[in-house]
Amino acid sequence: MKKRSVWGRCLAVLMTAVTLVLPGVQAGAKQSTGTRTLMMDTRSYQMAPGNLYDIKVSVNGANVSSSDAVVYSSRDSVARVSRIAGTDKYRVTALREGTTYVTSEVYGVHASVRITVKKGVQKRGEANRSVTVIGTATSQSEMRAVWIPYMSLDMSGQPDRSEAAFRRKFDTLVSQAKNSGMNTLIVHVRPFGDSLYPSAYYPWSHLLTGTQGTSPGYDPLAYMVQATHQAGLKFHAWVNPLRVSLKGLPKSFSSDNPAVIWKNDASKQNWTMEWNGEWYYNPGITEVRDRIVSGVREIVQNYDVDGVQFDDYFYPTTASAIDSVSYLASGTSLSVADWRRQNINALVSEVYAAVKQTKPAVLFGISPQANLQNNRNMGADVATWGSQAGYVDYLCPQLYVNSSNAVMPFDATAVTWRKLVTNPGVKLYFGLALYKADSNADGGTWITPGSVMAYQIQKSRSLGANGFMLYSAAFLENRQTGSEMAQVKKLLHM
């Protein structure tokens, strides 16, 4: 490390060495193991507004390079960090008085330096940062999941709707996922306020027989969990908590559907919400939240699931008309937007508590939209979920964009989410748009020589994300995505 000239006041000097050892791996093992070592001079600095200095990041180890490192400032308004093109250095620009932490991260290992920007401080020169990482992610430590949406389970239009036919359909999905290197399935079990299992709270899904409320004569969820575990994979039950209908589906509702019962009761008509011909449950009603919580508890209690996941369907609009009656009845002094976020937070925390009280080892996670403003508009308080305990075990934002996206480029958006998830008890996964790979989506920017998915997985790793989820299973073995999946399987050592 280079000698430095006069630096001004130095708050502290500390050499940090971090070694992470994954389960079953011995410290000091060869590079092919999961051992990761990071060494970084975490000297604290003061610098004046307008001053610059460069941070050098060197990365060595199996399957890693300097381009895998991510360096960022916790407060961009105090000091901004940018990579110096063509080098392994990052330039820190002091902007205004305050304190920030500049963090280097590579594959989940990180170290930070505290920077105080203060007027009158002597200008600094170059500061070296040396980072060494050994190893890479393993199939056991990394979430490698694929979503199985309701469309892939739909039997309603099939001439053969038997249990045997359903099993064959699901067995194919399991086989494709395993052959693609996945270790977890995220399976739709409640897409429309219904269920793909015998429920005390929701009607049978129309997906199984063509008619909502009609039993198929077998338990699809029981078989799906069994088949998934027999293949050595994990099973997360995917639940839409509020959505009752979407784009004309289902075509009809059973008489025992709670939404139908409540709509026909004059005193409970505000327990559901309608928007653009679609139907949702109203989370501002305590009894509605209780129903949703009971439905999740039922799954965790009766089935050997490894996790439960909500997706991004919360409030469908910012329009106040959809729940104005319940908002006024609440007597709250909060704005409509804040009241809605309070309702969703209550639902999320209540579901989390129910899961942990029933089976503490079962995970509860949410896969929200990647756009933070959209989340706020929908009542999804992702900043709270990612920073405070008692809400989720993981967040998996749907980063369905690539690096060419003009509004939300993948790399910058991923860094934003990395900064947002600050609670060490909350894991961060990234949802990736396999369905867009090698397609004309987004102006043809996804048509590449099979490299987008592998790049995004590598970038996710470099940011310290705990894994990824692909949308969807229908594209694992698909002519469109063949070259993309070949690169993914190579990356996963398949």
Regions found by a protein language model. Name each.
Residues 180-216:
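Aromatic-lined carbohydrate-binding/catalytic grooves of carbohydrate-active enzymes
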Residues 136-167, 237, 242-298:
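Active-site-adjacent "subsite" loops/lids of carbohydrate-active enzymes
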Residues 168-194, 303-305, 463-467:
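Catalytic domains of carbohydrate-active enzymes, especially glycoside hydrolases
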Residues 161-180, 207-231, 342-347:
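Aromatic- and glycine-enriched glycan-recognition loops and surfaces
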Residues 391-409, 417, 424-494:
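Substrate-binding cleft of secreted/luminal carbohydrate-active enzymes
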Residues 152-164, 202-217, 275-290, 333-343, ...:
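The substrate-binding groove and active-site-proximal loops of carbohydrate-active enzymes
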Residues 166, 259, 263-388, 400-401:
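Polysaccharide-binding and catalytic clefts of secreted carbohydrate-active enzymes
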Residues 26-129:
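Extracytoplasmic soluble-region selector
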